[in-house]
Structures are given as C-alpha cells and as structure tokens.
Amino acid sequence: MLRWAVIFLVIALVAAVLGFGGIAGSAAGIAKIIFFVFLVLLVISVVMGRRKV
C-alpha cells in the first residue's frame, strides 16, 4: 500500500504542476484533493507498516 501511495502522490504532483502552470486549469483543484488524500494515505502506510522488533 505504501508503494501505491507514493505512486499516486507523484501522479498528483505532476497533475498539480500541469494545473498550476495553466496547461489544465481545471485539473488544479482535482490535483490538490488527490495530493492531500494520498499524502494522508502515505502517512498512514508509514505508521501502520512499521514492523515491531
């Protein structure tokens, strides 16, 4: 799950760059939402994915 969170975080960042650059103005809002959703998923994956020794 951590791998997927990182992949979608990168996709969201690319979409944000395109959206904020004026290439696709309507994609900026979607990119913000996706970015924060997968940022939360990344944090959850890091915290829950730790193996206790």
From Swiss-Prot:
Family named by the database record: Belongs to the UPF0391 family.
GO cellular component: plasma membrane
Chain ranges passing through the membrane: 4-24, 28-48
Gene source species: Pseudoalteromonas atlantica (strain T6c / ATCC BAA-1087)
Protein name: UPF0391 membrane protein Patl_1732
Main location as per UniProt: membrane
Subcellular localization(s) per the UniProt record: Cell membrane
NCBIfam families in UniProt: PRK13682.1-1, PRK13682.1-3, PRK13682.1-4
Keyword match rRNA processing: no
Sorted UniProt keywords: Cell membrane, Membrane, Transmembrane, Transmembrane helix
InterPro entries: DUF1328
Membrane topology type: Multi-pass membrane protein
